[in-house]
From Swiss-Prot:
Residues 456-476, 645-665 dip into the membrane without crossing it. It comes from Aspergillus oryzae (strain ATCC 42149 / RIB 40) (Yellow koji mold). Keywords: Autophagy, Cytoplasmic vesicle, Endoplasmic reticulum, Golgi apparatus, Lipid transport, Membrane, Phosphoprotein, Transmembrane, Transmembrane helix, Transport. It is found in: Preautophagosomal structure membrane; Cytoplasmic vesicle membrane; Golgi apparatus membrane; Endoplasmic reticulum membrane. This is Autophagy-related protein 9.
Length: 951
């Protein structure tokens, strides 16, 4: 009875199909190249459509009368089919017994007799038929293994009788519809009259590979990985050294554990006295099995790297010939420049693959590569990472330890992150990197949740078998890597770094890894300074005493050893412990204790140091407001910024506790995980399914708020809905600002836009602690820590809170400057920056300019509907003039789906002016200065309305 209960948790109920069978069936039926079909816009009834015998005969008669000849199969079709087997409809239907789907228009679109006019005639295409023939002549014929007899012999897939096949063969003999080249020897003809692909010009070959890219997500990932690896030679060197490192760790560990007799170590004078002869033959069975297992893994990894050299060579040619970036330049070029050249290549070379069918060419040209600006590239590269960022931000993952005395402690390590990607991401996403449409329907919610729960349990079981080997390897690798550093500088034992959970909390949507790493690395000096500043008087006193005693003993021993080194270094202070041993002990103790004592010249200002940390991390929870100086905030930050040795110990212990988290904690949130992917996934034309927060759609969740009394009466319910559909602590708005900081400014460098030198901050005197309490730190920040980032051209002068947190809306520019790295539908508009006083995030910050104080945290539109309901309307700041770009973030109606809808600055200004009771038309009626300003504003509004669209 107990066995049946245990098995029932892993096996599906009787009579119900497995959720994996449903997922595989849906993946097989879906067309990965048709993004619109994956959005659920395809007819289900049309999938069962099949050509009848009468329709086939009529088609043959029409073809004979019109003299139509179907083009021969493209030489590249087997190549494309080999890379993506699911695209071959004939193969899929042969396995499933289904019939070919007839792609039709969705139900909500009527049939238009002029639809055929939308297609570009073949004569006007860039490649034309001559280019097709030239491309076919240069490509090798398909190998026999890649031919599809069903495609050649049958006009339509599906079961066919002998009579139908005989009639079809007779028709083919009478009407040569296909030049299949039967009876010829294409291999011999090719080898005699055509060169092979190896002799093709590398630039033309790179262009052909670029034009025939199927999966743009995977291609852009290869481009980005190649950029991070600094070229083909650096990547090959890194892989070779990683293989050598792995072999050295395994070999040296085997030598230390099996080839040395530690019982003879004492008293031995030679290496031969402690070595075990032919130690590999005397190894235990478990050690031998582990060594063979690691050897097979090493050989497989080396073979994988060798096979990947061809792909790296293709990527090298793509960078060198199409982007104009050499291996020496790739180490210094910025990613923004790479994106700019990708967009230039996109515009100069449209997706016109001559060896691709018309339907596939239309897909690639109109959807795939035309949606490839900085925003689209970031969304493709971080399609999965954006979901994980949102999961961590909304606290959906239950990472608590199921241990009685550690239930309130979260554990998130690299091992657990790998298991989450395996259990969740590989479950939700298919092989093409798209979200499975089954997760977007609530009809399979229970089955998907049970399947996810079983995946967690199965992964926990597998971790039990894998954990011992991983623990041993990481222990040896960490020891070999860091022991020498700790020996040279013992103070490094107390060095700190951010935990893996902190990195996912700090990372923003659409922020690539190298940009995030640069931003976080700049915060380390300020984070260490902040942690070391807090009062630890007792610890400092004890550490000072220990440093004094150990330093005195070490100095005396060192002085005596200098006087007579030959005699004194061999002198035993205790039994078998010489002076050299105690010199090392006392020196290490002194270095460690001295590292705990702060410098006497340091000025105590924890609030200033933490603001500098927030400047780069962009992490500022709501409960930190007004408490930056408190010890509670320090403890919470210390959990995110721990010592390296503690992080390593947690990583080792996580291999023991990870199975328990997978068994008990994560299965509890399986329902919420399924609901999250269903409710926070949006479809973007040409891109597929994306996380709703990554598209920066600020109007999601707020359009349902009705205006007037209804919205006020239901404000409580709307607040709950807005909280559910919004990020915490203004994550999406901070990501939006950070993205514009990275990809925004394009104006040429001039003396006014260059980074200016600022003197060191003027710290308050020790005799005036009230200056800190009164908020003078904000004035110092504004005066000394102003930064000019890439987006300073459209954000104005940023505050000392760093990239993404400047005071937008109070600069000299009335509207943000467009970016060459963003397409028109992603360009920032002035309505996106209306009174976006980002410096008002921090209540202790005060600008030198008169601004309206705001004590609320960063909030986007969908994160503050209750405040909008309470106010009833957005009121104009008393310090904002009519010509400024003031307003609330997201007041524009424009978003990614409706980029043509927007509210210009003038509309909001007219509305605000009406609220203030001033009749601008009446004032500007005379032909005076105000009248000219009013006319100028209207002209500017009309011009922006024609050229700028909202994100």
């Amino acid at each position: 009875m107990m066995t049946s209960n245990i098995l029932s948790r892993f096996l599906p109920p009787n009579g119900s199909p497995s959720v994996y069978e449903t997922l595989r069936q849906q993946d097989a039926e879906s067309n990965p190249s048709d993004v619109e079909e994956r959005a659920g816009l395809e007819f289900e009834d049309d999938r069962r459509t099949q050509f009848s015998d009468r329709e086939l005969e009529e088609a043959m008669v029409d073809a004979a009368r019109d003299g139509i000849r179907s083009p021969s199969p493209s030489p590249s079709e087997p190549f494309l089919t080999q890379r993506s087997p699911q695209r071959t409809s004939g193969t899929a239907t042969a396995k499933t017994g289904g019939r070919r789907r007839k792609h039709s228009r969705p139900r909500w679109m009527h049939q238009d007799p002029d639809d055929g006019d939308d297609d570009v005639p073949p004569s006007l295409l860039v490649e034309g038929h001559q280019d097709d023939d030239e491309m076919r002549s240069r490509l090798p014929p398909p190998p026999p293994s890649h031919r599809h007899p069903q495609r050649e012999l049958s006009p339509a897939p599906g079961p066919s009788s002998r009579a139908d096949r005989a009639r079809w063969n007779t028709t083919r003999e009478q009407l040569p519809l296909h030049n299949d080249g039967r009876g010829q020897r294409p291999g011999v003809i090719w080898s005699l009259g055509h060169p092979n692909l190896a002799s093709v010009d590398p630039k033309e070959k790179a262009m052909w590979l670029w034009a025939n890219v199927e999966n743009l997500d995977n291609f852009l990932k290869d481009v980005y990985t190649y950029f991070l690896g600094n070229g083909i030679w650096s990547i090959l060197l890194n892989r070779g050294l990683s293989l050598l490192t792995f072999a050295f760790v395994v070999g040296f560990s085997t030598f230390l554990t099996n080839c040395i007799d530690y019982r003879n170590f004492r008293g031995s004078r030679k290496m031969d006295d402690i070595l075990i002869q032919q130690c590999t033959k005397k190894m235990s069975m478990s050690s031998t099995f582990l060594l063979w297992l690691l050897t097979v893994f090493w050989i497989g990894k080396a073979f994988q790297y060798l096979m990947d050299i061809r792909r790296l060579k293709h990527m090298h040619d793509f960078y060198y010939y199409l982007l104009g970036i050499s291996d020496s330049e790739i180490q210094t070029i910025s990613w923004q420049e790479v994106v700019s050249r990708l967009m230039t290549l996109r515009d100069a070379n449209p997706a016109t693959a001559g060896a691709v069918s018309a339907r596939h060419r239309k897909f690639m040209g109109s959807q795939s590569k035309q949606r490839m600006d900085a925003h689209d590239i970031a969304n493709r590269l971080m399609r999965k990472e954006n979901y994980l960022i949102a999961l961590v931000n909304k606290d959906i993952l239950d990472l608590t330890l199921p241990i009685p005395f550690l239930r309130n402690r979260q554990l998130f390590s690299q091992t657990l992150e790998w298991n989450i990607n395996l259990c969740i991401m590989d479950y939700v996403f298919n092989d093409q990197g798209q979200v499975r449409t089954l997760f977007l329907k609530d009809t399979h919610r229970k089955a998907l949740s049970e399947g996810l729960r079983r995946r967690f349990i199965f992964a926990g079981i597998m971790n039990i078998f894998v954990a011992p080997f991983i623990v041993v390897y990481f222990l040896m690798h960490y020891f070999f890597r860091y022991f020498n550093e700790y020996k040279k500088n013992p103070a490094q034992i107390g060095s700190r770094q951010y935990t893996p959970l902190a990195e996912w909390k700090f990372r923003e949507f659409n922020e690539l890894w190298h940009l995030f790493e640069r931003r976080v690395n700049m915060s380390y000096p300020f984070a260490s300074r902040y942690v070391d500043q807090f009062p630890k008087d007792k610890t400092v006193q004890v550490a000072g005493f220990v440093a004094f005693v150990s330093g005195a003993l070490a100095s005396v021993l060192a002085l005596v050893s200098i006087i007579d080194p030959e005699l004194f270094l061999g002198f035993e202070i205790t039994h078998d412990r010489t002076v050299l041993f105690y010199l090392g002990v006392f020196g290490s103790v002194w270095a460690f204790a001295r590292g705990l004592v702060p410098e006497e010249t340091n000025v105590f200002d924890p609030e200033f140091a933490l603001l500098e940390v927030i400047d780069f991390t962009h992490y500022f929870p709501n409960h930190w407001k007004g408490r930056l100086h408190s010890d509670e905030v320090r403890k919470e930050f210390a959990v995110l910024y721990q010592m390296k040795i503690v992080i390593f110990l947690e990583e080792i212990l996580s291999m023991i506790f990870t199975p328990f988290i997978l068994w008990f904690s994560l299965p509890k949130c399986s329902d919420r995980l399924i609901d999250f992917f269903r409710e926070f996934t949006v479809h973007v034309d040409g891109m597929g399914y994306l996380c709703s927060f990554a598209v920066f759609d600020f109007k999601k969740g707020t359009n349902v708020i009705s205006q007037g009394g209804t919205g006020r009466r239901e404000s409580g319910r709307q607040d709950l809905r807005a909280d559910y559909f919004s990020t915490k602590d203004g994550k999406m708005l901070a990501s939006y600002y950070g993205f514009l900081d990275n990809y925004g400014g394009n104006r040429p460098a001039n003396p006014s836009s260059r980074r200016q030198f600022h003197p060191p901050p003027a710290f308050p005197t020790l005799g005036s602690p009230s200056a800190i309490e009164m908020g003078n730190i904000g004035e110092r920040l504004e005066r000394t820590q102003t930064r000019h980032g890439p987006a300073a051209t459209f954000m104005g002068q940023q505050s000392g809170l760093g990239p993404g947190f400047g005071a937008a809306g109070f600069g000299d520019h009335a509207s943000p400057a467009p970016s060459i790295l963003l397409d028109p539908h992603h360009q920032p508009t002035a309505s996106d920056f209306r009174t976006a006083n980002r410096s008002a995030l921090y209540p202790r910050f005060r600008s030198s300019r008169p601004v309206r104080p705001i004590t609320d945290p960063i909030e986007d539109d969908n994160e503050s509907p209750s405040a909008e309901i309470r106010r009833g309307a957005v009121k104009k700041s008393p310090h904002t003039t009519t010509g400024s770009s003031g307003g609330a973030i997201g007041t524009s109606d424009s978003n990614l789906g409706e980029s043509w809808r927007m509210n210009l600055i003038g509309d909001e200004l007219d509305k605000d002016t009406g609220e203030d009771g001033e009749n601008v038309d009446e004032i500007a009626g005379n032909a005076g200065v105000l009248g000219l300003i009013q006319q100028f504003q209207k002209v500017s509004k009309d011009n922006r309305g024609r050229t700028t669209v909202g994100i």
